[in-house]
């Protein structure tokens, strides 16, 4: 197996990733007739896992176990799930779900983390340490990131989805467009800005300064005793 630093999963396979040194490995656990229908290959530093073209398949079990020294990208397109078995230590990484698949895994340590959902999938992770955190939920998916330590955080929700953050950050920028919710009342920021367009809600926690802008029926609730820059409506104390 050639070296790779990115993982791309298409369709319905479930993948577990283990970070370990040495040559990368890929193990497939399924029935023999399914193995021949899979398309697993490395191209442009990316391990692609999916099915061959024009294949319709049903199966009881399909698990792909992957190990590699480092990952800088994880992308799920479809209904497959990816689990980080023993955490992940890397520099910059982009994690994305498009469709109904899920990504889970704890203990992520990186420089910059860009993590996003487009569709109905979910992302769940705890114990994240990074410098720059970018969070995006577009669609009806849910993202839950617990015990995060970041320097700068930008989080946005567009649609009916939900993003839940806990932990701490020096500075945060929050935005909601649509009916979604951004719940960060347990995510302590020194400085924060919160913008709502539509009927969604933001709950946040700021210690030093909070800027709020709302349009529509949405609202912003806050914890802490920050200096406030806010309009006449749409802000309330938690």
Please identify what each model-predicted range represents.
Residues 1-98, 104-116, 124-136, 151-153, ...:
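Acidic (Asp/Glu) and glycine-rich low-complexity loops/linkers
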